[in-house]
Amino acid sequence: MLRFFRYFLELVYPSRCPGCGKLIHTGGDLWCWQCQTQVWNPRMIRSSCTEHLSGCYTLTDYEKGMRKCLIDLKFNHKVPSARGFHLFLEKFPWWDSLADFRVAIPVPLSMEHARQRGYNQTDIIFEDWMIKQGKTYLSDGIIKIRNTVPQLQLLRNDRRHNLEHAFHVNRGVSLKGEKVLLLEQRCLRLIQNFKRCA
């Protein structure tokens, strides 16, 4: 019965690539091959390692279909298209090296953006996936305690100071001794010393 229902839905609402909108076969990937190859570029960002940060990984380039999909999710409330991100999470080549990072926490939005959107897009992209991988997902593990100027409006030297003392570990959350995956929609950051980040 479930198979028939899915078949019926596919006839009425055919699957489309979230990147370009082209019709795709439901038995395959959610992204068309062309969009996948245009954005798929897993790597560790150079200069991302610091005393307290093990590295910053990114799975795709932020352009073309990926940029469109993230903008649709953030600003146009196209939440169903977020299921397409799991394809890239599945293909990420370094999950084995992250096995001892047991806790996953999204970078929090400002209170104003959270109120406007009603959700944190990072939760929508990562939460189900991380839970299926056996990670403890703390959607409110970090809170933003003061508003900041959008980073895009600042010079490189001013960006670090803009974020100082902007985040804090939420009351009742203990991360002492934990290695934490700090998640953001445009990159996956690894934090070993959480105090420095907070």
Residue map of PLM features:
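Glycine-rich phosphate/pyrophosphate-handling loop used in enzymes and phosphotransfer proteins
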Residues: 1-198
